[in-house]
């Protein structure tokens, strides 16, 4: 099935056409389509980024998993998320961050950018090693 979006507001002006697993964007893209969504009130974007999410793995998977959270993000049009460091272990050193990165690599449905903790254990007393 081929879908066409014409007269739509597009991230970068023009037409947006989904054809054979490719997106064509341009001012004069002409492709026959099974369905044409022609409406100036439609806006088409390549994807959104959420810079504040709580994917609670490792440590709190009963609240949210990387798999469930990123699948939900994908369904909502998000192509990337940035996850907060309130985890166990807290990603305040490379060793702890690696635990999180391994889970992300295994389970994420979209790109995940993890934030490290600024202070050791998120305690607010000693800066973590940010080098």
For every predicted segment, state its role.
Residues 4, 13, 27, 39-41, ...:
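Detector for Asparagine
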Residues 12, 38-39, 44, 102-103, ...:
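Short, flexible, glycine/charge-rich loop motifs used to bind or transfer phosphoryl groups or to couple energy/partner
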């Amino acid at each position: 099935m081929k879908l066409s979006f014409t007269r739509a507001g597009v991230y970068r002006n023009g037409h947006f056409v989904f054809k054979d697993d490719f997106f064509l964007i341009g001012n004069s893209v002409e492709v026959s389509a099974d369905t044409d969504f022609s409406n100036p009130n439609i806006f088409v974007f390549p994807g959104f980024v959420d810079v504040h999410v709580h994917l609670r793995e490792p440590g709190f998977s009963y609240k949210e998993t990387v798999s469930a959270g990123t699948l939900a993000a994908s369904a909502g049009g998000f192509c990337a998320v940035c996850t907060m460091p309130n985890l166990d272990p807290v990603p305040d050193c490379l060793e702890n961050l690696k635990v999180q990165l391994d889970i992300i690599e295994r389970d994420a449905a979209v790109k995940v950018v993890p934030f490290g903790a600024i202070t050791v254990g998120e305690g607010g007393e000693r800066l973590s090693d940010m080098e």
